[in-house]
Amino acid sequence: MCIRDSKGIVRVGCTARVTEVVKRYNDGRMDIITVGRSPFRITQLLNSDAYANDELLQGDVDFLDDREHRTDARTQEELMRLYEVCHTLIFEDYPRNLEGEAAENLSFLVASTLPLDLLWKQQILELRSEADRQQRLVGYLREWAPHLQKEERARARAGGSGIN
């Protein structure tokens, strides 16, 4: 999976596993739900003109490994706390996907679950250190959580309907 920005196809993406086919169309297209897997960098697009024709892109990639796997326990705990707060405010439910999650995957779990800006998620994907990803997410969620709490209070005052 890769996204496109104003400059074209970004060079860092990730492999994806299809977890669910939501809908099949008569022309063969499908609405699917996927889970990102291994990050990669595109080294060469073999058919870059295919994108303009809405066709499948093909290319050569290098799979990316993290530079380091150590994380700071305090940063990790704060990220989990902020994730729980934001998830609960957005989805009105406690996140159940934290149990048994490895520390080296926490940033990807948080970024994939919360409705963050797509280009912001791209920045997280491009970082090659779990510690860096966790620090970046903590900074973002620290700023975002108060806005979510403010929106929640406004919804509660409006009777939960969002209509005044």
Feature names for model-found ranges:
Residues 4-164:
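N-terminal low-complexity, acidic/polar interaction/targeting segments
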